[in-house]
Amino acid sequence: MACCLSEEAKEQKRINCEIEKELRKAKRDARRELKLLLLGTGESGKSTFIKQMRIIHGTGYSEEDKRGFIKIVYQNIFMAMHSMIRAMDTIKISFEVADNEENAIMIRQVDYETVTTLDSQSVEAILSLWADAGIQECYDRRREYQLTDSAKYYLDAVDRIAEPNYLPTLQDILRVRVPTTGIIEYPFDLDSIIFRMVDVGGQRSERRKWIHCFENVTSIMFLVALSEYDQVLVESDNENRMEESKALFRTIITYPWFQNSSVILFLNKKDLLEEKIMHSHLVDYFPEFDGQKKDAQGAREFILRMFVDLNPDPDKIIYSHFTCATDTENIRFVFAAVKDTILQLNLKEYNLV
């Protein structure tokens, strides 16, 4: 009987050891997943960043995937033209060519949210409107209304996009605007570690959905659009977009949930800042700026300092990078540096040594 018990005890001990071994392995495996939370106000470039991760570290976009973007590109073209035609009325600009009044009426009749084709009549009307001096003046005054950053890119490419065998390029896909509603997760494997990138909607109405994303966050990746210093919110036309971004950043970095998460600040759209700073002066919107006019470098350093100064904890380092989310090589380079930072900060915890 004693012998029998001894055998049973041995077997039980073996089973317990196996269970403990499996539990340790499960814990170790769970720790090899890094959760990166992408935050920022609407249109700061979060979704574009996720697309870049898919191109650089994932499977990219197949021909079938690209075809799925055709109608969204068409919708972006019509949406941009609608925005400018509406703004022509609001800011009281006339068309230079009288016929474009008719073209504008025709384009306004197209529902840009459901359009799936780009017919030759619409193409002619869009090309004529885009060439009109009135529309060009309206485009130059785009900070006075809401217009997507990619408007010029698509409108300059209407002839190519209107081709019958059109297939969106990676750049077309990166620039397409689809507001993020809900939460998008994109996991990718890098050196046997899973990076789980979580993109949440940036518009105010989307932010209440973030709360359950806050657990076990390795790093906060906060995006700021450098070019938004002179723009107002989609939701409120008397509030500056960059002030909203600053307020959100201050809230995020002081949240109790994130006290153990590293913070990486992406100052995005540096290309648009370089373009805009030549005619729209930072000092007109941020009087404390004492740098030179038309100095993109000085402007972006000032904006970086504004955000870093919001950090109340002297022991917490804010890691910052200037980015252009539509430039794959720039993002490849920046994310390699970010990955190294994250891994260095988590060597022990994630069993990487």
Curated annotation (Swiss-Prot):
Residues 264-271 are annotated as: G4 motif. GO terms for biological process: adenylate cyclase-modulating G protein-coupled receptor signaling pathway. It comes from Mizuhopecten yessoensis (Japanese scallop). Guanine nucleotide-binding proteins (G proteins) are involved as modulators or transducers in various transmembrane signaling systems. CDD domains: G-alpha (cd00066). PANTHER family: GTP-BINDING PROTEIN ALPHA SUBUNIT, GUANINE NUCLEOTIDE-BINDING PROTEIN G(Q) SUBUNIT ALPHA. Belongs to the G-alpha family. G(q) subfamily. Residues 195-204 are annotated as: G3 motif. Residues 323-328 are annotated as: G5 motif. The keyword Metal-binding applies. Gene3D superfamilies: GI Alpha 1, domain 2-like, P-loop containing nucleotide triphosphate hydrolases. This is Guanine nucleotide-binding protein G(q) subunit alpha. Residues 35-48 are annotated as: G1 motif.
